[in-house]
Structure formats: structure tokens, C-alpha cells
Amino acid sequence: MEQIVEKIREVAKRVLGDEVYNALPPNYIEVSPAPKDTGADYASSAAMKLFGQMKSSGAATSETIKSPRDLAETIKKLVEEDEGFPFSIEIAGPGFLNFISRDEYWKQILAKYSDNFAENISYRVYSDKQVICEFSDPNPFKVLHVGHLYTSIMGESISRLVEFAGGKVIRANFGGDVGLHVAKTIYALMKKDLKAKDLAKPEDIGKISLCYVDGTRDYEENENAKEKITELNRLIYEIADAGPDKIYPDNTYPKEVAELYWAGRTLSYKYFDDFYARVGVKFDKYYPESTVAKRGKKEVEDHIGTVYEMSNGAVIFPGEKYDLHTRVFINNEGLPTYEAKDVGLIFTKWDDYHFDQSIVITGNDIIDYMKVVLCSISQFAPDLPARTKHITHGNVRLPGNEKMSSRKGNFIKAVDVLDEVEDALGNLGKTPEIHKISIGAIKYAFLKYKIGGNIEFEAKESVSMTGNSGVYLQYSGVRAKKVLAAAATAKRAERTTEAPEWKLNQYEKSLIRELDQYRLVLKEAVGELAPHKVANYLYDLSQEFSRFYEHSKVIGSDWEKERLEIVRTYLNVLEHGLNILGIEIPEEM
């Protein structure tokens, strides 16, 4: 399409003159794939826009250019003077330019991708930039639910988009290893007389999950329990601050709490690591809240009176002054809240990496919360919020559209989703490839939707071999691999006549045209940090490949070499795009 745009620009300058042409905004001349019912390959409304620009600028129109269609006819005539231009032009309606390609054009496109695929899709907008991608952010002492699965998959794909664009990505994970949720869990563990030794095996994470629900219920319904949990919360901050090597007197309350705390914390992080390994995510840096809380509290305290204010024994940020809402950063017990910990996090990230950009991916229920936190920091360290991009996603809901809650215990565990999809693929058998297929199905099911809205996940739909699914794309990739493998071992009779000239059929043209869109899709996906752009493109591309496969014999045809190159290029694009989504193509399906 760039070739058409450049040619229209060249002609427009001749027709309009330098003064009018130079006043045109950037990207004023646009070309896009033509609607299928036109019979053209590309289309442009440039003549109509340029004619309007001529009139509004007061430029004189000639005797032969009195309408947009006249201008379109002039552009057509001047463009077609170039015999090397690989398109014929038809005028439609009031002045649409429809471009119909010659075979030579598609051969050039195919050769371009075949000769240097990586260079032709390159888009290094993040080159030499250090970017922190923070995502997933589960809390120790809680079980991972399907929402964590979603944000882990989305965060990994966004990280890969930035890496494709040349960025040095640090994958970061921020989680609450201190706070009321920990105190509630430990209170319930102690109530059930569970000890540190009872939190040693991977399956013991279930005990933590149940105790969090029980502890939350006690906190909300029992005043005596609430007082004890509040005191536990204060003690846990001290235990976390002292570290795991502090020795407490035997048979004391602090020792029992410390042992439970460190055993539960260790079990939680091991559980997280196992889960992330299963979904193909590896974090470079964990930021437990206990490691940033002090820094956040200090930054807040250092700016009391200038940014933050005292209110009833607590420290607040008066958000109403900035058309936001007021939030507490240090509570009246002197403990830093989530807000202060986020302040500490952004400064700790900066100390560690001096990032060019920090991308934070969370649920959209904390949009307003993050606005307050970042606004408060911008009053005394404006560069850090300016470098921070907050991307939010919707909730994962249970049947009946009820939001999941680990407090209530009515949530879908992340591992249950993984297991359910593997079960749905049972007809494929428990092969080594089953994991690639199942995790690919889940990733695609999440990533094909634009980030921001709510997600409803159906296991059976995600493993469909015919619909818009990851399994369909993987199967298409396996099919392409098999064609190339068969070609490598096929026995061919020696040709006795010269092969006829390769005249592309409509399926070859359509597939090559779709392949040529990939670099543009990547630019959009990187610019918007939008994996769904890649996912939906790959589905459209694979449908084109399916039509090509059905109607274009490859092995043994007169144009086997050329068609194998189409298959090879398709596989390159598919593998590259699926890699951005974190999906692998299995060898067999």
C-alpha cells in the first residue's frame, strides 16, 4: 500500500502545486484494502479529499477538474504513465480510486517477506528503552483464581509486544505479603491449631485458601476476632520487617505467628512459581509489599504538610483538590496502607532500574485509586507518574454475571481452568503436546478480546477446531508444517517441459495480501499495547490460508516452488504472531 500512497502523493503534488500540497496534514492520503465486492485490491478516497482541499484553499481548478471524479481521472491518467506501476486503476462513484494489482506486485511482496522476514516486519519504536511490565500481582496467603490467569497471560503478551519493538523488558510482580488478608489467614490457621509443618507440601495451599475465607468471615462477624486480627496485623508487619532469621523465645505467641507467617509465605511463592511455569511466564523481579512499605511510608511522611495532610491521626491525600477523592496513606495505627505501598513501589522500581516506562496492568476496579496515588506522587516527583502507564482489564465473572471474590470463596481457581481445558481436549489423549494445545487455547480465548471489558470463559468453545480459537490456529500451523515436511521428502518425476508462467489465482493473491498486512497490524498492536489486534489478524489470516490450501495444489503442481514459498511465509507469520501471544504450534494434532 505504501507504493500506492507514494504514487498518489507524487501525482497530487503535480496537480495541486507546492503551496496546496505542502499544506496537507501528515497521513492525509490514505489507502486501504478494497471491499471484496469491488473486485479491486486496494481503494482510496484521496481524490475526493484532495478536491475538497483545493476548494477550501482557494486554489484555482482547471477547466478539466471541476469535480472529485475529474480529479480522480487526472490522477489515474498521470499514474498510469508509469509503466512500472504494478496496478491498474478504476474510478468508482463520485471519485473513488480502485487499484487492481498485476501478478508482478504480489510476486514482489512474497519475495520481500521470503528474503528477509525479520527486517520487513521490524518496528523498533521501543529500541534501547528500559520498560518495566508489572502484572499478575497475586497476594501470598491467597489462592490464584482465573483473574490472575487472565492478567498473567495479558501481561506476558504485552511484554512480548514491547520486546518485539526493541524494548528491554523487566517483568515485575507486586504482591501483598503483609496486610489484613495475611492476618485473617493466620488467625484462622491458629484457630484450627495448624502449625508451620502443616504448610510444607504444595497441596497445603488449599488450607491457606480456606483459612482466608474463614478469617474474613470472623473479622466481619465477630468483634473479638476483629480485635485479635487487628493486633495480628501489627505484629506481622514487625515479623516481616525483622526477616526470617530473627529468633523468638520458645513457646511464645510471636514465635508461633512468625513460623506460620514464613511457612505460609514460602509456600505461597513456591505455588506462584509452579503456576507461572505452567502458563509460560517468568518474572524477573518480585516486589513483596513488605519490601517497599517502609520506603512508601517515608516518602509520605517527608511530604506531610506540602502534599499529604494529617486527619484524625491518619495521613491522607486530599484528592478533592485535584477533582479526585481523598484516600488514607498511613492509618491511625501508623501502618502504611496499600496507597503508601504503591508510593514505595514506584520509587523502588526507579531505584532498581531507572525505567523509561513502567506499564502497570491491573483490574479496572482500581482506576480511580491509581489516579489518586499517581496524582499524589506527581506533586513532588512528577517524572515518575509521567513515565507510568496504567492499563486496566475487566473482571472474570461466574455464571450469572457475579463477580468473583476470594473473600467469599466463590471463585474459580486458576488451576481448575487449566485442568478443565485439558479435560475438554481429552479426545487428543494425554500426549506431551496436550499442554501446548490447552494453554494455547486458554491464551487465545483471553487475548482475542480487547483489554478493558469483562471476560467470560467457556472451555468447550476455547478448544473448538473450527471456530475462532487457539486450537484452530495451532491446527492451521500443523497443517502448514506437514506440507513443508512432505515437500522435503517427496519424489518427483523429472520435468520434460518448461513450467508455464505462474499466474496467481485469487486464493494466492488473497493470502499474500493478508500476509502483507502483518507489519501494519504489529505497528497498531505495539502502539496501542493491544494483543487482540494480533490475535484477530491471525484468525483472519488462517482462514485465508485454509481457502488457499483447499483450492491450490502445492506438491506436484507446476508452481510447487512458488506455492511452497507462500506456505513457508504463512508459517513464519503465524509462528511469529502466536509467539507474541505466548502460544506454541505443536508438532502433531
Residue spans for each PLM region:
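Non-catalytic interaction-recognition regions
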Residues: 1-107, 118, 125-589
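Short, charged, solvent-exposed linker or helix-capping segments at domain edges/interfaces
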Residues: 108-113
